[in-house]
């Protein structure tokens, strides 16, 4: 059976990562979480004094970007990949509200995207991968055989994020999360480098009112079509 590249793009908190992880596990592909890579760069910047309040010392980050190496390793207990920053597991650290509130401006920096895209393209050379993010189908893998663009209303996405953080014991107000979601949408869609947009040949999936099972059924059907094409 031929192996393909699957690119899943879309807005923040649409459940892209869960969807991509589950699909990769189901079909035996490698999953690459591009959003986690930008979160890891953000965490590195926070921990290394590159942020001064909300201001990024771009010159310092540019000097250090070559020292930031991100990889994914499967957790033997969960069967899911964890994100490693320079050899250290940072999967939980990169999911905090502090990182969420700072990741969009980091992602908007051209030299950061250039470095991450190079790492992603290296990971994806052998095909048989599922990658999710903002510009996978448009910039990272424009020749991907299956491209999906995921959307849902801002309110539904904020509620999902609220529930996710609450389950982890991180208490944050719904309004703050909704504002963060809307702010990230604006930054992601208007940035100069690789703005968030649907590739012309991507399939649109609005999962506002879909169950996980319905979404999975749709994805598997599209995957089957793509490998037979």
UniProtKB/Swiss-Prot annotation:
Question: Per its UniProt entry, what is the enzyme's top EC class, as one word?
Answer: transferase
Q: Where does ATP bind?
A: 10-18
Reactions accelerated catalytically: CMP + ATP = CDP + ADP; dCMP + ATP = dCDP + ADP
Please indicate if the UniProt record lists Chaperone as a keyword: no
Listed A to Z, the keywords are: ATP-binding, Cytoplasm, Kinase, Nucleotide-binding, Transferase
Looking at the record's lineage, which domain of life comes first? Bacteria
Keyword Plastid included in the entry's annotation: no
Localisation: Cytoplasm
Its GO biological process annotations read:
nucleobase-containing small molecule interconversion; pyrimidine nucleotide metabolic process
Got a GO cellular component term for this one? cytosol
Instruction: Indicate where this protein is primarily found.
Output: cytoplasm
Per UniProt, what is one GO molecular function of this protein?
A: CMP kinase activity
The EC designation for this entry is 2.7.4.25
Q: PANTHER family this protein is in?
A: CYTIDYLATE KINASE, CYTIDYLATE KINASE/PANTOATE-BETA-ALANINE LIGASE
The family line of this record is: Belongs to the cytidylate kinase family. Type 1 subfamily.
- Entry's HAMAP family? Cytidyl_kinase_type1
Q: What NCBIfam families does this protein's entry cite?
A: cmk (TIGR00017)
Q: What is this protein called?
A: Cytidylate kinase
User: What is the native source organism of this protein?
Assistant: Bacteroides fragilis (strain ATCC 25285 / DSM 2151 / CCUG 4856 / JCM 11019 / LMG 10263 / NCTC 9343 / Onslow / VPI 2553 / EN-2)
């Amino acid at each position: 059976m031929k192996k393909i590249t699957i690119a899943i793009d879309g807005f923040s908190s649409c459940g892209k990562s869960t969807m991509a992880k589950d699909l990769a596990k189901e079909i035996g592909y490698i999953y690459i979480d591009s959003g986690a890579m930008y979160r890891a760069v953000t965490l590195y910047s926070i921990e290394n004094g590159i942020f001064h309040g909300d201001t990024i010392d771009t010159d310092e980050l540019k000097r250090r970007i070559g020292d930031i190496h991100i990889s994914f390793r499967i957790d033997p207990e969960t069967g899911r990949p964890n994100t490693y920053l320079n050899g250290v597991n940072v999967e939980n650290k990169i999911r905090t509200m502090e990182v969420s509130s700072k990741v969009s401006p980091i992602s908007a920096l051209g030299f950061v995207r250039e470095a991450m895209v190079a790492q992603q393209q290296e990971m994806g050379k052998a095909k048989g991968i599922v990658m999710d993010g903002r510009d996978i189908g448009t910039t990272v893998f424009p020749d991907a055989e299956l491209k999906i663009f995921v959307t849902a209303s801002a309110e539904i996405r904020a509620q999902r994020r609220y529930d996710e953080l609450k389950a982890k014991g991180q208490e944050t107000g719904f309004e703050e999360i909704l504002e963060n979601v809307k702010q990230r949408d604006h930054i992601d869609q208007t940035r100069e480098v690789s703005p968030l947009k649907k590739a012309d040949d991507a399939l649109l999936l609005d999962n506002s009112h879909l169950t996980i099972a319905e979404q999975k059924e749709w994805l598997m059907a599209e995957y089957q079509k793509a490998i037979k094409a």
